[in-house]
Amino acid sequence: VIINGFCINTKFLYTIKFYIQFNNTILILLFMFEGKKILITGGTGSLGQALTQRLLDMEVETIRIFSRNEHKQIEMESKFQDERLRFFIGDVRDQQRLEMALEDIDIVFHAAALKHVPKIEYNPFEAIKTNVIGTQNVIDACLKNNVEKAVCIGTDKAVSPLNTYGSTKLLMEKLFVTANNYVDPEKHKSKFISVRYGNVFGSSGSVVPLFIEQIKKKKNR
């Protein structure tokens, strides 16, 4: 490409364009979360902790970690040692506790879910109570507290699901997306968003560690 008489490599231009777009996205995120009060359901999980770390790097006012794992909360509190962190012991199955935890919250990240596929296959209704009914509880609590935005952490397993886990995650996403249909803009400012990810390295429910172990065994043969 010729610009002002200079020949510039096209790949270089694409790199510069990507760099500018990436940094603009970072700036948008920084302003989006600045001064916000955030709650993360399932916040003691691997994804919840990674999200917490990223949010703490921004100028958030406070982050509430909502989970039923008391031991992990203690570990997480010791790990981060940040006065902006608050910890709530609770379960998404408990509507009343959710409503209390979401008081004055601006943004919710809903990461709480049962996700170990074999266990869920033998305990399907438990998965429904947490992943489906629990998600509806989160939606209702968000509406009651007039939360600005709620983000459901979905999964690629929800695409043409082959097991109970994928099916419940698909229902989670559908509940979040359809929640926007019955939100009265005159009464509620809440917006519900669903995002998807694949197998997360380091996640307790990820298949990645299994793949690594299989590769190691194959090498040792």
Feature roles, as predicted:
Residues 39-54, 58:
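N-terminal Rossmann NAD(P)H-binding glycine-rich loop of SDR-like oxidoreductase domains
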Residues 67, 89, 129:
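Conserved residues in the N-terminal Rossmann fold of short-chain dehydrogenase/reductase
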